[in-house]
Amino acid sequence: YTPVHPRRKRLTLLEPDEIAAGANRVRLRSENANRDVALIYVLFCTGAKPIEIARLEVRDYLNSDGSIRERSEMRPETAVNGRSRPLFFTSSRACAAVDAYLVERRRRKLGVAVPASGFDVYRGLDPSSALFLTEGGWPFEIGGRGPNDQRETCRLMIATLRSIFKRAGWTGVTAQSARRVVARR
């Protein structure tokens, strides 16, 4: 008798050019292309968990003058472990993708600032609005995992990322494997 060893899952690691090619496929196949491409790049740029990405706010990405916060901070209330940590927006592709998405948001008047606060700060967006919104213009809903497990999750963000990975043509890629790519760099 020879025991059969279960197949180990092959770790899917994407190179920067594969990420860019996948982002281009998403741009062609998605109804919310700017947001979806920005989500890809923010995931691979920051290594944040899906729930943390759902909790990011405009002020985490932008300074009040509208410039990008290249060295930001994952606020304690955003981080899963409740501790702040550095958050870097230094990838030119990631910043270009998020900027294109924010231009679209302002054009569609999603999460814009009230006129009294002025349209010249935070590029006219409400600094406390979620950085990423659903197709309907709402923040991604965060809730408990179940009746016996009160830890928080963001099912819609996870489903959105799965859908994006499928559109990108990436098999075996998950948010967790994307985070491993960041950890290995």
Model-found features: residue ranges?
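Conserved catalytic core of the tyrosine transesterase superfamily
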Residues: 1-185
